[in-house]
């Protein structure tokens, strides 16, 4: 099983995938985030954040106040399972997390916490 995926983000406020499947044989999983647009991160920055689907709205709203220097995430937010930093055009960042943190029977989601992006930039994470 390939225990990694590359997710591209764009100036059109989108990720190139709406669903990430993790093979249950993976002990860890790595997400590399790229930005194929041309806009800088203060204008059209994106990050990749993993949480339970239920925690997603709260993380995003709390993150707005944190600002770009904290990647639009509240410091020490225990609801965040994994995240990249905010990147702009031509940049990339990656994060590796322990698959055992994903409990069976819980719905997980990924999203961008840049203010206003969550409505378009989100998807599901499942372990199969």
From Swiss-Prot:
Chief location of this protein within or outside the cell: periplasm
Binding sites annotated in the UniProt record for Cu cation: 46, 112, 117, 121
GO cellular component, one term: periplasmic space
Domain Plastocyanin-like: 1-128
Localisation: Periplasm
Keywords: Copper, Disulfide bond, Electron transport, Metal-binding, Periplasm, Transport
Gene3D superfamilies on file: Cupredoxins - blue copper proteins
Disulfides per UniProt: 3-26
Keyword Cytoplasm attached: no
Keyword Electron transport in record: yes
One term of GO molecular function: electron transfer activity
Domain of life: Bacteria
PROSITE patterns: COPPER_BLUE (PS00196)
NCBIfam families: azurin
Function of the molecule: Transfers electrons from cytochrome c551 to cytochrome oxidase.
PANTHER family assigned: AURACYANIN-B, OUTER MEMBRANE PROTEIN H.8
Protein name, UniProt field: Azurin
Source species: Pseudomonas fluorescens biotype A
Lineage, highest ranks first: Bacteria, Pseudomonadati, Pseudomonadota, Gammaproteobacteria, Pseudomonadales
